[in-house]
């Protein structure tokens, strides 16, 4: 890859993760949301086919998590498959096509996200609600 091609790739990746406007800022000066976007950009620089996201929405406000979901959807639009481990359920429900719920490593539900969340076992284990 030439220097020019690498620069173009970086520009494209920063645009994909909504960081183009911050391209000249130091990482330490970025907000938590933008640091998470930067982590995505670093991973995308390797041109992966699959990304594993582990609790990426942790620590974000609901508004920030929503903005991160938009960023993740942009990444998915680049034909990158995403495996996402997360406890911020509203972020998952806004983004995923399929949800798998584990409890101590055991599968308790899988399928369409809203149907999975309505499952009595998921309600009991994760919400403490007896249905």
Predicted regions and their residues:
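Glycine-rich phosphate-binding loops of nucleotide-dependent enzymes
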Residues: 1-131
């Amino acid at each position: 890859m030439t220097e020019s091609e690498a620069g173009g790739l970086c520009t494209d990746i920063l645009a994909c993760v909504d960081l183009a406007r911050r391209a000249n800022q130091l990482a330490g000066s970025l907000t938590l949301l933008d640091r998470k976007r930067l982590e995505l950009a670093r991973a995308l620089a390797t041109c992966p086919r699959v990304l594993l996201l582990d609790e990426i929405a942790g620590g974000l406000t609901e508004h920030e998590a929503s903005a991160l979901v938009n960023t993740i959807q942009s990444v998915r639009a680049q034909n990158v498959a995403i495996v996402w481990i997360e406890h911020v359920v509203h972020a998952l429900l806004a983004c995923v096509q399929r949800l798998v719920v584990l409890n101590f490593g055991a599968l308790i539900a899988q399928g369409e996200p809203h149907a999975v969340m309505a499952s009595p076992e998921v309600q009991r284990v994760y919400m403490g609600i007896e249905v």
